[in-house]
């Protein structure tokens, strides 16, 4: 899941 969308794409892929 792309969680970075909420945090600002920087953390995308974190999971």
UniProtKB/Swiss-Prot annotation:
Indicate yes or no for the key word Chaperone.
yes
The alphabetical list of record keywords is: ATP-binding, Chaperone, Nucleotide-binding, Stress response
A GO term for molecular function? ATP binding
User: What induces or represses this gene?
Assistant: By stress conditions e.g. heat shock, and by the herbicide dichlorprop [(R)-2-(2,4-dichlorophenoxy)propionate].
Question: InterPro entries, alphabetically?
Answer: Heat_shock_70_CS
Segments traversing the membrane:
none
PROSITE patterns, alphabetically? HSP70_1 (PS00297)
Asked whether the keyword RNA-binding is assigned, the reply is: no
Q: What does this protein do?
A: Acts as a chaperone.
Q: Give the similarity note.
A: Belongs to the heat shock protein 70 family.
- Name of the protein described by the UniProt record: Chaperone protein DnaK
Question: From which source organism is this entry?
Answer: Delftia acidovorans (Pseudomonas acidovorans)
């Amino acid at each position: 899941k792309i969680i970075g969308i909420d945090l600002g794409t920087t953390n995308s892929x974190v999971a």
